[in-house]
A protein has these predicted regions:
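Conserved glycine-rich cofactor-binding loop
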Residues: 9, 16-17
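Conserved mid-core segment of classical short-chain dehydrogenase/reductases
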Residues: 73, 93-109, 128, 132, ...
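Substrate-binding pocket helix/loop in short-chain dehydrogenase/reductase
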Residues: 99-100, 104-112, 138, 217, ...
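C-terminal substrate-recognition "lid" of short-chain dehydrogenase/reductases
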Residues: 120-123, 127, 131, 135, ...
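Active-site helix of classical SDR
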Residues: 123, 159, 167
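Residue(s) in the substrate-gating loop at a strand-loop-helix junction
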Residues: 143
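Short, small/polar-rich loop/turn modules that mediate ligand/substrate recognition or access, typified
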Residues: 175, 179-181, 186, 251-253
Length: 265
């Protein structure tokens, strides 16, 4: 891979597994030093770090409970001491499926805190430095549910619509920062549909109807994703890396679906 991000530092939240880890690996392959953040045992975190360094760059884990603004602030300070944050990817996310009337209030609070408020706090600290240096990329991993709604996902949908709106505001505020030569500062959302990760396994099982796992996958896709294909985490990683290119300097404020036609219906 073209190591065009050599000398850049990236922070990817929620990057010890799944989509976030694939993004961290892709950025490392492109030459960026990558700060990872996320949950897991010491062994899992060590394995994630090794996979990122094996992809071609230096990596370090920075811990923080993303429900707590003070811990987020301390994490950003530690990452900035390690290297200026040139690329910020907010990927951490949780969900809880239940009818609106049955959603536990604590689930609402946690989902909004991790999926939306944490991104606000990281962006608020990282964007001014990006603007000063003339280059910066914020990529918020939203969801197709930041563009359309589904039943039984009120907190998740609210958080993802919120992060799309937050990203548009930040994109407008920083649109004139930097130049084409420096790369500019952009803020965008990637909005995946179904992606092959452990997060969707309960929904696959719920669609099996006594059949195989493959039957469950097909039923899940037939319901909403016309391509009948799952995205893979590395597909999302490739999109994030492309958004970091200088040629993407004028692509900002976008919410880009990677959903196999879900939102085209």
């Amino acid at each position: 891979m073209d190591r065009f991000l050599q000398g850049r530092t990236a922070l990817v939240t929620g990057s010890t597994s799944g989509i976030g880890l694939a993004i961290a690996q892709a950025l490392a392959s492109a030459g960026a030093r990558v700060a990872i953040n996320g949950l897991g045992s010491a062994e899992q975190i060590e394995a994630a770090l090794k996979s990122v360094t094996d992809a071609g760059s230096e990596s370090q884990h920075f811990d923080a409970d993303l429900r707590k603004p003070d811990q987020i602030a301390h994490m950003l300070e530690a990452v900035q001491a390690w290297g200026n944050i040139d690329i910020l990817v907010n990927c951490a996310g949780i969900q809880h499926a239940a009818p609106l009337a049955e959603q536990p209030p604590q689930k609402w609070d946690d989902i909004i805190a991790i999926n939306l408020s944490a991104a606000f706090h990281t962006m608020q600290q990282a964007l001014p430095g990006m603007a000063e240096r003339g280059y910066g990329r914020v990529v918020n991993i939203a969801s197709v549910h930041g563009l359309v709604a589904s039943q039984n996902k009120a907190p998740y949908v609210a958080s993802k619509f919120g992060i799309v709106g937050l990203s548009k505001v930040a994109a407008l505020e920083y649109a004139a920062a930097g130049s084409r030569d420096s790369g500019g500062v952009t803020v965008n959302c990637v909005c995946p549909g179904w992606v092959e990760t452990p997060l969707i396994e309960p929904q696959i099982q719920a669609h099996r109807n006594g059949g195989s796992r493959d039957d469950g996958v097909r039923a899940l896709l037939e319901e909403k994703q016309p391509s009948l294909r799952m995205s893979l985490p590395e597909d999302i990683g490739a999109m994030v890396v492309w958004l970091c290119r200088r040629e993407a300097h004028n692509l900002t404020g976008a919410a880009m679906p990677m959903d196999g036609g879900w939102t085209a219906q």
